[in-house]
Amino acid sequence: MENFFIVKKLASDTYGKALNVDLDRLLQAQNKYTLQELISYCSALTILHYDYSTLAARLSVYLLHQSTASSFSEAVSLQAAQSCSRLSPQFVDVVYKYKAIFDSYIDYSRDYKLTLLGIETMKNSYLLKNKDGVIMERPQDAYMRVAIMIYGMGRVVNMKMILLTYDLLSRHVITHASPTMFNAGTKKPQLSSCFLLNVNDNLENLYDMVKTAGIISGGGGGIGLCLSGIRAKNSFISGSGLRSNGIQNYIVLQNASQCYANQGGLRPGAYAVYLELWHQDIFTFLQMPRLKGQMAEQRLNAPNLKYGLWVPDLFMEILEDQIHDRGDGTWYLFSPDQAPNLHKVFDLERSRHKNAHREFRKLYYQYVAEKRYTGVTTAKEIIKEWFKTVIQVGNPYIGFKDAINRKSNLSHVGTITNSNLCIEITIPCWEGSEAEQGVCNLAAVNLAAFIRENSYDYRGLIEAAGNVTENLDNIIDNGYYPTEATRRSNMRHRPIGIGVFGLADVFASFKMKFGSPEAIAMDEAIHAALYYGAMRRSVELAKEKGSHPSFPGSAASKGLLQPDLWVRCDDLVFSWEERVAQTTQGVLTPKKWWQLRLAAMQGVRNGYLTALMPTATSSNSTGKNECFEPFTSNLYTRRTLSGEFIVLNKYLIDDLKEINLWTEAIQQQLLNAGGSIQHILDIPAEIRERYKTSREMNQKILTKHAAARNPFVSQSMSLNYYFYEPELSQVLTVLVLGWKKGLTTGSYYCHFSPGAGTQKKIIRNSEKACSADCEACLL
């Protein structure tokens, strides 16, 4: 009976709201199961009510608390005493010096607010362990550890900001990236999430980049590599008189390195390789991710890597003309040793006018006229080959090279040649005597934290964005850098990436449906507020600490904010300020934007501010939906490194309970339909419309939402698409629409599988882009 009394107390309002669970059922179960086994038992009952999952989470927290220290300083002391302690002596000294403050302020009851997915993920990935794998801290300890790392490891211990940051983390208002969470306070605090490398076409650098990528991966970073400068297969090497192997063998080498250099032993390494479409080896590149086919059968593929295409406007124009029979689609292929610098130039304007500023187009056709091309194909042939691979593995990603460069605040620094693991980071990088390897530190804001009874708290969101900006700026100074080139880049540009999660929760709370005018307007306003709050704080930090060294010549130095770059490109109407003012009910007015422009001209601390990354772990921990995406399903099992857990859409359940429709019959129909409610006709049409899953809605809706938020994104976004069937025409429709709307990301993952309504089982959410093997830049 002792176990039952524990369960009964955990189900009461002692640890939050009282739970709607059947205590009689649990009384019978406790005779059969241990407390640990009851966690799985309760999780399996989630289909009855999401409170069973909450009870399972509370049980998991309770057991963790039973086996860990009851104060923060004691937890640190026990870890420091270990023979192989990861904690840095400086961190331990700070904790000992201020232990009375930390111990009295930390609130372990907040651990009980974690979801089951959240506490299990924390235990598996983030909480520090001893050499035997025994967990040595609680989630609240981890949050305090991160806060101290950010504000307590410099020349001055900023206690006010330590406690504020702890509060924001522990109340799940903000989250910091995975490397920050598991490396904060350690002897080698690599806190950065994303690294961008540019591979040069010489043997020394080719191998240097294998080593560099491996070292970065070992510290928890995700990597994006540009391969566009590597000469094509069979190209002549004048120094040796031999022929080049091209990119294929090099990709296989990086694939092997990734498998070996896992992220601190916590999860697999994660690399993405990028190539431009004019490269002679493009068809080889497109076949290498495949799990089936000739290359896979010969084991010449590299399926563990992620792949990305860097797509210029010229290709999209030729493709569109070919699709509509306005041209033959001719596309020329080159080897960069014979046609140099194509990846180092971009088109500043999209106009087809002969006097338009289009450096890439000019150089491309110059090389065509000089007959430097090594092959000829068509745009359709390339996109068809891309599509064959996407059907199998969901990528290569598509990044619109020219849009990314022309809308970059750092376009004066150099051409952006590639992105990162999840195609949301866009930092210039190059090799040479003054090499720069792009680095970005990530965090995300929980949009659901600002839901009020009858309104949305845009002021609170602005303030939180400012707090995260200051956090990330401090991380730049306090983190460990694996190479001098990463340090040089980060200190020069000081880029940060603030993302979001819980947008679908916001819409569900206000009973909005994706694609409605009010939802699109709110999407725009939320990201405008996020950007505004980050820029405002970055300007304030510049007054205190100075601007980033590459500020002179940046768009901001000329009084141009991120949305102004979109207006300049004719991708955003000039009246956007009035629209945002109306949606935010006067919180963000045209006058405030004008004042921000004037202030930014005087100095900005950070070269980039916002980037919309996947947020799997943050969403898992807090029970909110991932990043800016719609709900993938209303019922599914989520597979993570920690195991599989049932996730139920609580907003749908609450709406059905309001009208007395959450019955056993509806539960069974939902289960049979794999999480879809579109064919459950007992549910009102208005509710069915609001709870369409990401695949059930027209994919153009996702593009339109992306176009609404993208003008306020300093870098880019991890934009997924979901389709029932693999039809190229459907995919091209959204890609071309996104390109025409000026999006920076064409696509992250494209998912093709039967929809929820055709599956007679709970969806396994393995199709999510934020899977366990792709979490390096995730939060």
UniProtKB/Swiss-Prot annotation:
<feature type="site" description="Allosteric effector binding">
    <location>
        <position position="231"/>
    </location>
</feature>
<feature type="disulfide bond" description="Redox-active">
    <location>
        <begin position="194"/>
        <end position="440"/>
    </location>
</feature>
<feature type="site" description="Important for hydrogen atom transfer">
    <location>
        <position position="440"/>
    </location>
</feature>
<dbReference type="InterPro" id="IPR013346">
    <property type="entry name" value="NrdE_NrdA_C"/>
</dbReference>
<dbReference type="GO" id="GO:0005524">
    <property type="term" value="F:ATP binding"/>
</dbReference>
<keyword id="KW-0067">ATP-binding</keyword>
<keyword id="KW-0560">Oxidoreductase</keyword>
<feature type="active site" description="Proton acceptor">
    <location>
        <position position="420"/>
    </location>
</feature>
<dbReference type="InterPro" id="IPR000788">
    <property type="entry name" value="RNR_lg_C"/>
</dbReference>
<feature type="binding site">
    <location>
        <begin position="614"/>
        <end position="618"/>
    </location>
    <ligand>
        <name>substrate</name>
    </ligand>
</feature>
<feature type="site" description="Interacts with thioredoxin/glutaredoxin">
    <location>
        <position position="774"/>
    </location>
</feature>
<dbReference type="InterPro" id="IPR008926">
    <property type="entry name" value="RNR_R1-su_N"/>
</dbReference>
<dbReference type="InterPro" id="IPR013509">
    <property type="entry name" value="RNR_lsu_N"/>
</dbReference>
<comment type="function">
    <text>Ribonucleoside-diphosphate reductase holoenzyme provides the precursors necessary for viral DNA synthesis. Allows virus growth in non-dividing cells. Catalyzes the biosynthesis of deoxyribonucleotides from the corresponding ribonucleotides.</text>
</comment>
<feature type="binding site">
    <location>
        <begin position="420"/>
        <end position="424"/>
    </location>
    <ligand>
        <name>substrate</name>
    </ligand>
</feature>
<keyword id="KW-0215">Deoxyribonucleotide synthesis</keyword>
<protein>
    <recommendedName>
        <fullName>Ribonucleoside-diphosphate reductase large subunit</fullName>
        <ecNumber>1.17.4.1</ecNumber>
    </recommendedName>
</protein>
<keyword id="KW-0547">Nucleotide-binding</keyword>
<feature type="active site" description="Proton acceptor">
    <location>
        <position position="424"/>
    </location>
</feature>
<dbReference type="GO" id="GO:0004748">
    <property type="term" value="F:ribonucleoside-diphosphate reductase activity, thioredoxin disulfide as acceptor"/>
</dbReference>
<keyword id="KW-0244">Early protein</keyword>
<feature type="binding site">
    <location>
        <begin position="193"/>
        <end position="194"/>
    </location>
    <ligand>
        <name>substrate</name>
    </ligand>
</feature>
<keyword id="KW-1015">Disulfide bond</keyword>
<feature type="site" description="Interacts with thioredoxin/glutaredoxin">
    <location>
        <position position="777"/>
    </location>
</feature>
<feature type="site" description="Important for hydrogen atom transfer">
    <location>
        <position position="194"/>
    </location>
</feature>
<dbReference type="Pfam" id="PF00317">
    <property type="entry name" value="Ribonuc_red_lgN"/>
</dbReference>
<feature type="binding site">
    <location>
        <position position="222"/>
    </location>
    <ligand>
        <name>substrate</name>
    </ligand>
</feature>
<dbReference type="Pfam" id="PF02867">
    <property type="entry name" value="Ribonuc_red_lgC"/>
</dbReference>
<dbReference type="InterPro" id="IPR039718">
    <property type="entry name" value="Rrm1"/>
</dbReference>
<dbReference type="GO" id="GO:0009263">
    <property type="term" value="P:deoxyribonucleotide biosynthetic process"/>
</dbReference>
<feature type="active site" description="Cysteine radical intermediate">
    <location>
        <position position="422"/>
    </location>
</feature>
<feature type="site" description="Allosteric effector binding">
    <location>
        <position position="201"/>
    </location>
</feature>
<feature type="site" description="Important for electron transfer">
    <location>
        <position position="749"/>
    </location>
</feature>
<keyword id="KW-0021">Allosteric enzyme</keyword>
<feature type="binding site">
    <location>
        <position position="178"/>
    </location>
    <ligand>
        <name>substrate</name>
    </ligand>
</feature>
<comment type="similarity">
    <text>Belongs to the ribonucleoside diphosphate reductase large chain family.</text>
</comment>
<comment type="subunit">
    <text>Heterotetramer composed of a homodimer of the large subunit (R1) and a homodimer of the small subunit (R2). Larger multisubunit protein complex are also active, composed of (R1)n(R2)n.</text>
</comment>
<feature type="site" description="Important for electron transfer">
    <location>
        <position position="748"/>
    </location>
</feature>
